[in-house]
Amino acid sequence: MEQTLPTLTDCPHCNSKLKTGGLIGTNKLVSKKFIPIINEFSGLHHEQYCEKCAQKLYETSKGKFFIERNALDKTIESIIDCVPVISLQSPHKWEYDVLDMVTGQSTTGTGVFSEFKSSFTDFFGMQSGAYNSKISNGENLCLTQLRLKCIQLGGNAVIGADIDYAEVGGDKGMLMVCMTGTAVKIHNTEVLGQERIQSLEKLTKAVERRQYLRSIDVTNNAYVTVEAS
């Protein structure tokens, strides 16, 4: 025989009386989608909150969420290059486990190949610099994708990296840059040097925390909403 859970009469956090109707307003339990972010950033561990206390807790927690997320993004961006990405298939003295293939793709804006139609002088002047800049940006984006995917797999290096270029979009002159590689986990990390080891440890923690924050539902609501009846 199933047991019926007792109906709450007071808020588990602030002990305010719960009211579903009446002449002086209501005070209902808020939707459970707000609970994870409140608990994560307030230090509280209640399963439910009421309208009276949840709004301020939610606003404060949401602010802390975005501050930490932005700080993590800056940290990851500043040290992501510490993940080695090399074309060698079996680097000398590396002892590692193969994890999985990782890939990265980037498509530039329009007008890339139109630069080839310019004069010979222009091609070897300013326009060649703009063209190379677009390619370089695409390569850097692909490298970042490979490195992030490697860390997310629990690895610390990418070997056997390969890069390809292709024209896409017909006459729109768009360039796709594609990279592939194999994510590995190096066991004898001393081959990378102490500074890189420390950066990899910091990067791994930042990526793990960033992934966890992504699992928390942060709504666009400015105000908390109640549970549906």
Task: List PLM regions with ranges.
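Short, non-ligating residues that shape and space the ligands of small metal-coordination modules
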Residues: 17-24, 44-45, 56-60
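C-terminal edge-of-domain segments
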Residues: 171-211, 222-223
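Short linker/helix segments within small regulatory modules
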Residues: 25-47
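Histone-fold modules and their flanking histone-like tails across chromatin and transcription assemblies
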Residues: 66-126
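Short, flexible, mixed-charge glycine/proline-rich loop motifs
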Residues: 1-8, 16, 38-45
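Short, well-ordered alpha-helical segments
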Residues: 102-109, 115-164
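Short cysteine/histidine-rich zinc-coordinating motifs and their immediately flanking basic loops
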Residues: 22-30, 61-73
